[in-house]
Amino acid sequence: MKQLGRPTSDVLAVTMPCFGTTRRTRSNAEILCDELAVSFTEIDIANTVHSHFKDIGQDEQVLDVTFENGQARVRTLELMDTANRTGGLVVGTGDLSELALGWATYNGDHMSMYGVNAGVPKTLVRHLVRYEADIAASAELRRVLL
C-alpha cells in the first residue's frame, strides 16, 4: 500500500466463518489485521450455505466434496460482491502448486481478481511467511505468523 500511496486501512480483510471455523482461526485473523492496520469485517456465511444446501438437496451430515466446495463457492460469491460494492478487488491466496495440481475449488478459492501467490510454489510459501515473521514489527505479529 505504501507504493500506492494509500493507507493500509484501505485493505478490507474479510473473515467468513462457517462449519468448522475455530476461535483460533478467527482470533488470528483479527490479530493479523490489527497488527497490519487493515480494515476487518466478518460475514457469517452459515445461513447462506444452509440455504444453498437445501436448494440442491445436499445432506449436511454428508461431509463430501459438495459439502466442502459449497462453502468455498459461497465465500467467493461474498468476496466478489463485496469487492463490487466497495470498489475493490479480490486478492487471491491460492499458490502455484494448488493451481497447477487442481487443489482448489472451481468457482471457489481459485478465483480472484489478482492472484498474488499464483507464481509461488507451496514449497516456498513457508519460507516467505518465515521471512515476514523474522522482520515483523511486533512480537504479536510474529506469533500469529508462526
Regions found by a protein language model. Name each.
Residues 1:
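A conserved segment at the C-terminal end of the G1
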Residues 4-66, 72, 98, 144-146:
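A conserved beta-strand->alpha-helix junction
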Residues 50-62, 69-146:
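Nucleotide-activated chemistry modules centered on ATP-dependent adenylation/adenylyltransferase
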